[in-house]
A protein has these predicted regions:
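Alpha-helix C-terminal capping segments
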Residues: 52, 69, 73-74, 91, ...
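Glycine-rich N-terminal segment of FAD-binding domains in flavoprotein oxidoreductases
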Residues: 63-64
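Short, contiguous clusters of charged residues that form electrostatic/catalytic patches at enzyme active sites
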Residues: 39-46, 50, 67, 115, ...
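Conserved phosphate- and dinucleotide-binding cores of soluble alpha/beta proteins
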Residues: 11, 86-207
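A glycine- and small-aliphatic-rich helix-loop capping segment at beta-alpha/alpha-beta transitions
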Residues: 74-79, 148
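HTH-adjacent hinge/linker in prokaryotic transcriptional regulators
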Residues: 1-59, 70, 79, 92-96
Length: 207
């Protein structure tokens, strides 16, 4: 719609919400994202990896921050399902049991998306899931520029017993085109508390 294109509405599953933030519909490539806020992402990733116990069945979303988790849990006896080709390759080389979902490969984020991926994910029941996001606000929730990727995230989240969204401080206040989860739908692991979010009970800040 005209309002959506103008950045006045944010698309969510089941409706739309008014936006007082600038919508950023562009999807940065993996090469662009991997050089930004590296130390923050590594600290977040190390903490998140520490939440994984032996014998767990986890979902690992595509993304640079989730990618940094790999070096911190490859010594654990776990099974990982992922829609990220790069994650799957690294896990397999490290000897971790890994399952890569099938579907359409999205070139910019190197993530597998589409109905085939969603159909596969509905068969699984994960103990924990770790997800990336392009933006987060209380009103719009967790957002991403691509509707297909949002649907895969949403499907995987529904199959997780515990859900964690990994995002550095720069993602707060940002809104991308499509909401895949309400703000209160997961625990957030970040490196710095943002003004206006100090009283949120679902945020873990890594010093």
């Amino acid at each position: 719609t005209a309002l959506h294109n103008a950045g006045k509405l944010v698309k969510v599953f089941g409706g739309a919400v008014a936006s007082d933030h600038v919508v950023t519909p562009q999807e940065p490539t993996v090469a662009q994202k991997i050089t930004v806020h590296v130390s923050e992402k590594q600290r977040i990733a190390e903490y998140a990896a520490g939440l994984i116990g032996q014998g767990e069945f986890i979902y690992l979303d595509a993304g640079t921050t989730t990618g940094y988790m790999l070096e911190f849990f490859c010594d654990k006896d776990v099974t990982v399902v992922t829609n990220a080709v790069a994650h799957a390759q690294r896990l397999a080389k490290a000897g971790v049991k890994v399952r890569l979902v099938g579907g359409e490969l999205k070139s910019s984020t190197e993530a597998v998306v589409g109905s085939e991926a969603m159909q596969t994910l509905r068969k699984y029941h994960f103990t924990k899931g770790f997800f990336g996001t392009n933006g987060v606000t209380k009103k719009a929730g967790f957002t991403t520029p691509d509707a297909n990727e949002a649907m895969v995230k949403k499907t995987a989240i529904e199959q997780c017993q515990k859900k964690y969204v990994l995002c550095d401080h720069s993602k707060f206040g940002e809104v991308s085109s499509v909401t895949f989860l309400a703000f209160t739908g997961a625990d957030v692991i970040t490196d710095r508390i943002t003004e206006g979010y100090q009283d949120c009970g679902n945020i873990v800040v890594i010093e």
